[in-house]
């Protein structure tokens, strides 16, 4: 009898257990597609980024010109840049949907995989931020100035920390060079942590929409879910192609077509759309240090969610009250995103403050209390 190399070779065996013979719950829906879509996004971003890095120069006098050169003179440079810029937006869409799926179906109770996922989100945000600075346009420069300046809010070490990150007394060549180094390095750190994320996930197996143990009803990942995931791949690639070819600047800021000028401040400084919800929370607190802490907590609050789970049921599928609160949270995040892009004036300030309080209240108080109340209603003491 011939041995199957897929099951015996020490290296191929690892891939086989992760992608081919992986026991998967038979009832997982399309919402479980986003993990593999994120893997595809990461591969697309690393490949396009590598080709951009071959032509980009991390120097303040030539950075903007090198991006123009990529778009005008490099073979398909315009396409590579458009895919990379819009690929970042799709990456964040997939990340937010992936997190929303985890929140809805109680996947956060796999604490190790969940916490690694939150760290991955933080690294992804850091990568996107330093990447946005690289074209050295107006919004790149002023966005970097505003966000790095926030560190000066920390008592005693703040100013020293800012100058340490800048590499001088203002944002200059040293800043751009190190941001390019970080932008090149961090995706590979993300790849490493993704493997650890998968390792922890495969220790427990996937969750499913019912939130129940599915050990008695598992099917192999390939061919069932590998083909199901291909549908998501095609849809995402079509969407990315449509964005990159027809509406490449839809999600960007027109201000970034102007070369960076330290003497002229743009009328409205705002980050890319995927940071606007956190930016709105930052702006809604009048105190600088309070705003910075709220900004950080708006992301790291996700790490507290496993500890705040009070319901005896894992998934939201049979919990109508918590379902309502989940969709309230989604609507609230959309409102925060809209507010983050508006000027700092009334009524946007008040709406932002209400939405920020609601955001933290839902996570910390309302949803845990509702879970406890549902247990009482169902006599699940």
From Swiss-Prot:
The chain crosses the membrane at residues 34-54, 78-99, 114-134, 179-199, 227-247, 289-309, 321-341, 348-368. Gene3D superfamilies: Cytochrome Bc1 Complex, Chain C (1.20.810.10). Coiled coil: none annotated. One of its GO terms (molecular function) is ubiquinol-cytochrome-c reductase activity. Its cofactor is heme b. The keyword tRNA processing does not apply. It is found in: Mitochondrion inner membrane. It holds the Pfam family Cytochrome_B. It is a multi-pass membrane protein. Heme b b566 binds at residues 98, 197. Its main location: mitochondrion. Binds 2 heme b groups non-covalently. A ubiquinone binds at residue 202. Keywords: Electron transport, Heme, Iron, Membrane, Metal-binding, Mitochondrion, Mitochondrion inner membrane, Respiratory chain, Transmembrane, Transmembrane helix, Transport, Ubiquinone. One of its GO terms (cellular component) is mitochondrial inner membrane. Heme b b562 binds at residues 84, 183. Heme 1 (or BL or b562) is low-potential and absorbs at about 562 nm, and heme 2 (or BH or b566) is high-potential and absorbs at about 566 nm. Component of the ubiquinol-cytochrome c reductase complex (complex III or cytochrome b-c1 complex) that is part of the mitochondrial respiratory chain. The b-c1 complex mediates electron transfer from ubiquinol to cytochrome c. Contributes to the generation of a proton gradient across the mitochondrial membrane that is then used for ATP synthesis. The cytochrome bc1 complex contains 3 respiratory subunits (MT-CYB, CYC1 and UQCRFS1), 2 core proteins (UQCRC1 and UQCRC2) and probably 6 low-molecular weight proteins. PANTHER family: CYTOCHROME B. This is Cytochrome b. The lineage of its organism: Eukaryota, Metazoa, Chordata, Craniata, Vertebrata. The gene is mt-cyb.
């Amino acid at each position: 009898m011939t041995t199957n190399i897929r099951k015996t070779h020490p290296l191929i065996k690892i891939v086989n257990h992760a992608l081919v013979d992986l026991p998967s719950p038979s009832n997982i829906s399309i919402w479980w597609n986003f993990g593999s879509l994120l893997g595809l996004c990461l591969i697309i971003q690393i490949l396009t980024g590598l080709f951009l890095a071959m032509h980009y120069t991390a120097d303040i006098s030539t950075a903007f010109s090198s991006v123009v050169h990529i778009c005008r003179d490099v073979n398909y440079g315009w396409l590579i840049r458009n895919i990379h810029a819009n690929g970042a937006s799709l990456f964040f869409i997939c990340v937010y949907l992936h997190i929303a799926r985890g929140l809805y179906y109680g996947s956060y109770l796999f604490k190790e995989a969940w916490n690694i996922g939150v760290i991955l989100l933080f690294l992804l945000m850091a990568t996107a931020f330093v990447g946005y600075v690289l074209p050295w346009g107006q919004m790149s420069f002023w966005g970097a100035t505003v966000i790095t300046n926030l560190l000066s809010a920390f008592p005693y070490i703040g100013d020293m920390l800012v100058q340490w990150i800048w590499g001088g007394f203002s944002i200059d060549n040293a800043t751009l060079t190190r941001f390019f180094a970080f932008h090149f390095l961090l995706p590979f750190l993300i790849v490493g942590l993704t493997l650890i994320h998968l390792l922890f996930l495969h220790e427990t197996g996937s969750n499913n929409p019912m939130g129940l143990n599915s050990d008695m009803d598992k099917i192999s990942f390939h061919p069932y879910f590998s083909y199901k995931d291909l549908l998501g791949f095609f849809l995402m690639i079509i969407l990315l192609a449509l964005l990159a070819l027809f509406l490449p600047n839809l999600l960007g800021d027109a201000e970034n077509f102007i070369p960076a000028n330290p003497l002229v401040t743009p009328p409205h400084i705002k980050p890319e759309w995927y940071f606007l919800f956190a930016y709105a929370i930052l702006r809604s607190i009048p105190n600088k240090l309070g705003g910075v802490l709220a900004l950080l907590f708006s992301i790291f609050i996700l790490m507290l969610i496993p500890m705040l789970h009070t319901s005896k049921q894992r998934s939201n599928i049979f919990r109508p009250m918590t379902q309502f609160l989940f969709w309230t949270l989604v609507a609230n995040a959309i409102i925060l995103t809209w507010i983050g892009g508006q000027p700092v004036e009334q009524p946007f300030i008040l709406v932002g403050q209400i939405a920020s309080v609601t955001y933290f209240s839902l996570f910390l108080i309302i949803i845990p209390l509702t879970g406890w109340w549902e247990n009482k209603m169902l006599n699940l003491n």
